[in-house]
Amino acid sequence: TPKPSSAASDVYKRQFLWWGAVGGTAVWIGVIPFTGGLGTDDLLAFLLGVGVSGVLHVAYMAVLQRGYREGNLSTVYATARGTGPFLSVIVAILLFGERPSVLALVGVAAIIVGVVAIGLVDRGRAERQDRSLDLGLVFGLLTGVAIAIYTIWDAHAVRTWNLSPVAFMVGTMLLEIPFYSFGVRGRWAAVRTLGRTQWRRIVAFSILSPLSYILVLTAIQIAPVALVAPLREVSVVLVSLFGVFALKESRPGWRLAASAVVAGGIVLLAL
């Protein structure tokens, strides 16, 4: 059953996601004219690309939040962040005909293993001994599948139709707003309160979250998905290192070793 505190947390997350979509659209829409416009004259292709992407991203977020509600955060996060890149690599090889070198594939494997190890560092002994079905693991896997699906679709869209990453991101966020609006229906007073009290966090999120994916889309246009997808997970290492040196979190040896494995994988990709 869902955790008792999950209801209030879910409401907050939906409200924050609404502000993120609205704020991200407002921040980045003005950048479109300076970054190549839509990138294509085919308006139908643009609408199809962002329309499908918007639905996929909302579905991904819904599955992820359900996973956080049903299971341990570290389990869901590690499983999703390991499964997503792995499936993206497999599909990119099968559908896009990408052929990474053996060395690069070893690097990809190292990154995925290291990321999963970082995510599982805080799993309790009791959890590991529990033989019952781990819903966190199930939803982590489903989230990984969702990550792979939207990654492959977005790569196909920006490559095939030469769409501008900025315009694509803005279009996707714009289409997410109605979905998130449905999620916060009847709670608009609370949404406004959140906007007043958390505006600094919302502004930062509205700038940085879209920027991170715009950079991913830009990389996908010039590099194989099989290499870009795993490299997205470098942020997990940075957070882990911050936890070791700034927050003095437990099991620093494990965290540093896992981070070193990821770093080694990145080096192999660069060779």
Where are these regions (language model features)?
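Specific alpha-helical transmembrane segments that line the substrate/conduction pathway
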Residues: 56, 68-116, 167-174, 225-245
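Hydrophobic/small/kink-forming positions within alpha-helical transmembrane segments
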Residues: 29, 54, 58-59, 82-90, ...
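Membrane-interface interhelical linkers
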Residues: 10-73, 120-141, 173-205, 210, ...
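Membrane-embedded alpha-helical segments of multi-pass transporters/permeases
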Residues: 29-33, 89, 93, 116, ...
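Helix-coil boundary and interhelical linker segments in multi-pass alpha-helical membrane proteins
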Residues: 33-45, 91-104, 156-163, 218-224, ...
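Interfacial helix-capping/hinge residues at the ends of transmembrane alpha-helices
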Residues: 5-6, 61-65, 76, 88, ...
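Single conserved hydrophobic/aromatic residue that forms the stacking wall/gate
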Residues: 1-8, 12
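Juxtamembrane helix-loop boundary signature in multi-pass membrane transporters
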Residues: 86-145, 155, 250-271
